[in-house]
Amino acid sequence: MNNLMNPKYPEGRNLFKDKNILITAAAGSGIGFSTAKRFLEEGANIFISDIHQGRLNEAIDSLRKLDMGEVNGCLCNVTKDEQIERMFKEAIACFSNLNGVINNAGLGGESKLEEMTNDAWDLVIDVTLNGAMKIMRAAIPVLKDTQGVIVNNASVLGWRAQAGQSHYAAAKAGVMALTRCVAMETVEFGIRINAVAPSLAMNPHLSKTNSDELIAILESKEAFGRGAESWEIANILLFLASDLSSYMTGEVISASSQRA
């Protein structure tokens, strides 16, 4: 079988040995959790957050069973300033500093604009765009001490058009703009900021917020005929957080097999 259709899970290379990384929305079984797992496999200590206590506890237990780096976490709703402030304080209390922040929280859905309520629009913008902004704003003063990195999770919908995704696409386009603009503001502090823009990453949340018919159509349009595994997106997040991308800031990498 073509390896592109059946990718091989990578081996760890200690890219983040003794580094401390904060990852938002890291519970469950999507990109956030896969990213947390990959950072551990690369030698990092991690602090994760999520909005659901039960799911967060399960994620922490599962990651600790890997018996790799240190794993801690707390509840955090990225729309709430006080919860974000507490999350960073708890992370610093655990590790004394942070070397990187993975800004993963986001919320999507499927709805045509004509049928969309103000509340539905506002919720996606508040979590996906405003939440990303608030995490970045809180991370900058913390990362000055280590000349750390921020990696945002965007989407190719920030570039591409897709019916039923106007709220999500607008939010992710905003995340891309934040990435580029704020990266210019943090250069003087040695802080790099980049983003990854996945095309189609398979995870349970995708199935909950989109129809099976739409997902099948999207998979058929990818050159590999499949969506990315969540750990394949995590690998790009790791690259952007590592010294391997030391010359890059303000960039958005498309994680896509292009459209067939």
Residue ranges and their predicted role:
Residues 95, 133-136, 142, 226-255:
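C-terminal substrate-recognition "lid" of short-chain dehydrogenase/reductases
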Residues 141, 184-188, 246:
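Alpha-helical segment proximal to the catalytic Tyr-Lys
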Residues 2-11, 30, 160, 220, ...:
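Short C-terminal tail/terminal secondary-structure segment
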Residues 102, 187, 192, 248-250:
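Short, small/polar-rich loop/turn modules that mediate ligand/substrate recognition or access, typified
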Residues 136, 171, 179:
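Active-site helix of classical SDR
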Residues 112-113, 117-125, 206, 214, ...:
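Substrate-binding pocket helix/loop in short-chain dehydrogenase/reductase
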Residues 155:
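Residue(s) in the substrate-gating loop at a strand-loop-helix junction
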